[in-house]
Amino acid sequence: MIRKTLDTDIPAVMAIYDVARAFMRAHGNATQWPEGTPSAEQLAADIAAGGSYVCEVDGRVVATFAFLPGPDECYDVIEDGQWRSDTPYAVLHRVASDGTAHGIAAAMFAFAKERADHLRIDTHQDNLPMQGASLKAGFKRAGIVYVSDGTPRVAFDWLREA
């Protein structure tokens, strides 16, 4: 089940971020999320904006993501490619799982696709699992964008077929 994140979920979500950071480091992606990233402040901002979600299995929070309306300033400039559309879009950010449930990425993508006609997502060049999940969900590689700290990310977009 996917639902909006509650303030009472913050400890569980922060623990999921810890697990996700450890997974990334163990799988060759040591720099995408430095310690303390995403922060509790970022999570609180996502909750306040109404865009933070959790995935529950048997009443336990096992994953989280932000699903927010665009525009997102890190997508204003794209290199080594282009967005397939300039139509309004929603973004997926801060996707993380505790690794205990299968099909979480597919459920998150399906949730977002039910609510938007155009989606954008980005991930670190070393985050091969997220790149693979994005492609499997029908996203197309769009190019390279730069996040707020100036580091590059591989960007993907998805458009509902007419």
Per-region residue spans from a language model:
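Conserved acyl-donor/pantetheine-binding loop and adjacent beta-alpha core of acyl/acetyltransferases
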Residues: 66-100
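C-terminal "cap" of GNAT-fold acetyltransferases
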Residues: 84, 147-162
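Conserved GNAT acetyl-CoA-binding A-motif
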Residues: 114-126
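Conserved GNAT-fold acetyl-CoA-binding loop/helix
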Residues: 21-41
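Conserved acetyl-CoA-binding loop-helix of GNAT-fold acetyltransferases
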Residues: 97-114, 132-136
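A short beta-loop-alpha structural element at the N-terminal edge
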Residues: 1-15
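Conserved beta-hairpin
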Residues: 49-65
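Conserved active-site alpha-helix within GNAT-family acetyltransferase domains
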Residues: 106, 126-144, 151
